[in-house]
Amino acid sequence: GARLVEAGADVIAISDPSGTGEILGPRFFEEYAVTYLNMLLDGIEDGKTKTIVHICGQMRSVYQQINMVHSNALSFDAIVPMKEARRNLGERVLMGNVSTFALEFGDEEKVASLTKFCVESGSNIISPACGLGTKSPLRNIQAMLKTLKKEQNVKLAP
C-alpha cells in the first residue's frame, strides 16, 4: 500500500472474494479477514488516501465484525441487501451494489431500476457490485449514470 500512496493513489481498493462471512462465519471472519485486512489498511493510512474494502458473498452473519474493518468504505456483492447493510452498519460509507450480471446481460431499464433501488436503499457510492464485465454494453453503464444523476440530482461530467 505504501508504494501506491507514494505513486499518488487517491483511493486504494482491496477485494477479498473468498473472505466472506458465509464461508468463514463470525469467529473466523474476525480472526482472519478483519485482522489481516486491518493490517493492510493501517499500513496505508497517510491521512489523505482513502480505502475501500470489497467482500463477496452474504454478510448477514458478520455485520458486527465487518464494522470493525478500518476502511473508509465497504463494498458488497449484489446478494447483500443494501437496506439490511445500512441498518446494521449505521453511518458507515457503503458502496455498491448494482448487479454486475445485470450490467453485462440486462437491459437499460433493469440497470436503471437496480441503480434507483441502490440509491433508495442507502448506498453512498453507487457502483457495480463486483466489478464490470468486459462485455458490459456502454448503454447500460450510461443508464446507471443517468439514473444516478436523476435520483441524486448530481452533475456528471459530459
Regions found by a protein language model. Give the residues of each.
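Active-site loop segments of alpha/beta catalytic cores
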Residues: G1-P158
